[in-house]
A protein has these predicted regions:
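Glycan-recognition and catalytic cores of secretory/periplasmic carbohydrate-active enzymes
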Residues: 1-134
Length: 134
């Protein structure tokens, strides 16, 4: 689901660079809508879901939450629908309340499906870079 919401805004950036912004708007909103089906009641976006394989990872990874903010803001900019703005705000609230570590800094890698903080994976490392949460 993280890659889906990420794709919704990256496609817009690519289309804009090619001068094709209008042609991608509807598709970007459809992708954002599909990704939003993976939202939890607390405003977070689950990591990934593959219906064909019967796989549903309900962890909340740091980068997926960051991409949710950007993707839902982009959907709001494209559509003017304030519902997207609310989803972006909810995702940001989730980051601030659960992913961000105000005591020791940085963002936790993830919140597990059971609601506990994942302390096993790096808080800072190769995959954590300005691309997603800078």
């Amino acid at each position: 689901l993280g890659h889906d919401i990420e794709a919704s805004w990256l496609l817009c950036e690519a289309a804009e660079a090619l001068g094709e912004s209008d042609s991608i708007r509807g598709l970007a909103l459809k992708i954002a809508s599909a990704a939003s089906e993976g939202l939890a009641g607390d405003g977070s976006l689950f990591y990934e879901k593959d219906d064909a394989a019967g796989h549903f990872d309900r962890d909340r990874h740091w980068w997926v939450q960051a991409e949710a903010v950007v993707g839902f803001l982009n959907a709001w900019q494209l559509s003017g629908d304030s519902g997207w703005l609310e989803l972006a705000s909810d995702a940001l609230d989730y980051i601030l309340q659960n992913i961000s570590d105000p005591v020791n800094g940085e963002w936790h890698w993830s919140i597990r499906a059971d609601g506990t903080i994942n302390l096993d994976d790096d808080k800072a490392g190769f995959w954590k870079c300005p691309y997603h949460n800078g």
